[in-house]
Amino acid sequence: MPSHADLDRQISQLRECKFLGEAEVRALCEQAKAILMEEWNVQPVRCPVTVCGDIHGQFYDLIELFRIGGDSPDTNYLFMGDYVDRGYYSVETVTLLVALKVRYRDRITILRGNHESRQITQVYGFYDECLRKYGNANVWKYFTDLFDYLPLTALVENQVFCLHGGLSPSLDTLDNIRALDRIQEVPHEGPMCDLLWSDPDDRCGWGISPRGAGYTFGQDIAQQFNHTNGLTLISRAHQLVMEGFNWCQDKNVVTVFSAPNYCYRCGNMAAILEIGENMDQNFLQFDPAPRQIEPDTTRKTPDYFL
């Protein structure tokens, strides 16, 4: 098992955007799996904590996020998924977050996004990046096996419910979510799929999602869910919002998106949500880090958003 000294060396190397060797990644993922196995589908989190949305392999913007929000472990973080795909540095991004989780398990919470899946990563870049950087798919397999263990949701001080996507018509209560068997590939449909794929919508009730997975849910649904479960807010990611954060559904729901200039061309700001000692909320917005020299990519990934 890597010692603290080994982990500190690996974290320093990763902060310079230098990926680890295959054997080191394997050992790191095994350690992370042992930690995540002990976490819950609804993982309790204490305040203060800083809540972050999609990162999508934009490594230098993750470093900028830590510069703006405070470094790990000095600041407690809760990441709501989508660490990989689309950006140029999915390997370095996800390895750094997993290494921080192993080193400072109580200081950082990492949830599962819809891109933390075998099927999606084979289309949107992470699989190809692993092949390019390691010459085989082993590292992709270590990480996608680990993704099955990531918690689906988190609950900050029993008040703020955090997850990647949104609500499910199959899940009325947090106890329903606690009862799910999460240790599997993200299904194509059903409650676990919905948590990672659904979106809030201006229309009331449940709707068919244009994404082809999950549902859209109206303000009435969010209000009822919050009331039933004693919540003040649903915090989620999963959608590009131009200011980095967006309140909707009469402030029952907030979207947080933490990949600035998404896909290196969308022109959006990023944001993170600081939840303070007294559960006060503060958004920090940030622009992209200075552009680095872009690596040659061997395959163009599809343009449409997932």
UniProtKB/Swiss-Prot annotation:
Coarse class of the protein's main subcellular location: cytoplasm
Membrane spanning stretches: none
Write down the superkingdom of origin.
Eukaryota
Entry's EC annotation: 3.1.3.16
Cysteine disulfide links? none
Subcellular localization is given as: Cytoplasm
Q: Which GO terms describe its molecular function?
A: metal ion binding; protein serine/threonine phosphatase activity
What is its cofactor? Mn(2+)
Respond yes or no to whether keyword NADP is given for this record: no
Residues annotated as the enzyme's active site: 115
The UniProt entry, under PROSITE patterns, shows: SER_THR_PHOSPHATASE
Binding site residues for Mn(2+) 2: 82, 114, 164, 238
What reaction(s) does this enzyme catalyze? O-phospho-L-seryl-[protein] + H2O = L-seryl-[protein] + phosphate; O-phospho-L-threonyl-[protein] + H2O = L-threonyl-[protein] + phosphate
| Gene3D superfamilies to which the protein is assigned, alphabetical | 3.60.21.10
How many cofactors are bound and how? Binds 2 manganese ions per subunit.
Q: Does the keyword Calcium apply?
A: no
Per its UniProt record, what InterPro entries does this chain match? Calcineurin-like_PHP_ApaH (IPR004843), Metallo-depent_PP-like (IPR029052), PPA2-like (IPR047129), Ser/Thr-sp_prot-phosphatase (IPR006186)
Entry keywords, A to Z: Cytoplasm, Hydrolase, Manganese, Metal-binding, Protein phosphatase
Q: Which GO terms describe its cellular component?
A: cytosol; nucleus
Annotated GO biological process: mitotic cell cycle
Q: Where along this sequence does the record place binding of Mn(2+) 1?
A: 54, 56, 82
> Which family does the similarity line name?
Belongs to the PPP phosphatase family. PP-2A subfamily.
Q: What is this protein called?
A: Serine/threonine-protein phosphatase PP2A-1 catalytic subunit
